[in-house]
């Protein structure tokens, strides 16, 4: 009779890690949903633009975050000179935006078409957006740490199973 050691505690650890990862992923989704409501209040037109008219490929990206948190209001974007906005976008995107002039034009157009808020509402919304960006980044870092722990645990249970799982499209 050939028997293998009982690995119930390892499976329990894996179960807890995967459930915690799901919890963190749900937290990111919830935070992004909450952030979208604040984004609509601060920069209404940016949220409702179709994909071709969007100045940013990812509304939750670094350049978008910089625009949303470093410009006090949409009026500041409208009032910014073309050169100033181009330099800002180039610096914050680390020159990764291929067509800065087009992005700047789309951003200014969206800012011009957005609703104007009372100045007293602009600062709390900017703070809330900055906080949401920080929370999302923090959750992403935690998910990376959990992924590493899951990988380590799965390799401890069965190293071959991990490689098999990674080879399946949609899972790995």
What label would you give each PLM region?
Residues 1-171:
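A detector of single, family-specific signature residues
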């Amino acid at each position: 009779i050939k028997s293998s050691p009982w690995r119930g505690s390892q499976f329990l650890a894996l179960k807890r890690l995967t459930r915690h990862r799901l919890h963190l992923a749900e937290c990111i989704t919830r935070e992004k949903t909450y952030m979208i409501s604040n984004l609509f209040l601060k920069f209404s037109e940016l949220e409702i633009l179709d994909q071709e008219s969007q100045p940013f490929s990812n509304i939750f990206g670094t350049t978008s975050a910089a625009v949303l948190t470093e410009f006090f209001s949409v009026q500041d974007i409208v009032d910014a000179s073309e050169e100033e906005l181009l330099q800002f976008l180039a610096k914050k995107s680390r020159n990764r935006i291929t067509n800065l002039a087009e992005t700047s034009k789309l951003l200014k157009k969206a800012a011009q078409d957005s609703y104007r808020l009372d100045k007293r509402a602009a600062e709390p919304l900017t703070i809330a957006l900055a906080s949401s960006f920080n929370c999302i980044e923090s959750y992403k870092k935690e998910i990376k740490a959990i992924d590493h722990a899951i990988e380590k645990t799965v390799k401890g249970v069965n190293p071959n199973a991990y490689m098999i799982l990674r080879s399946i499209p949609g899972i790995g």
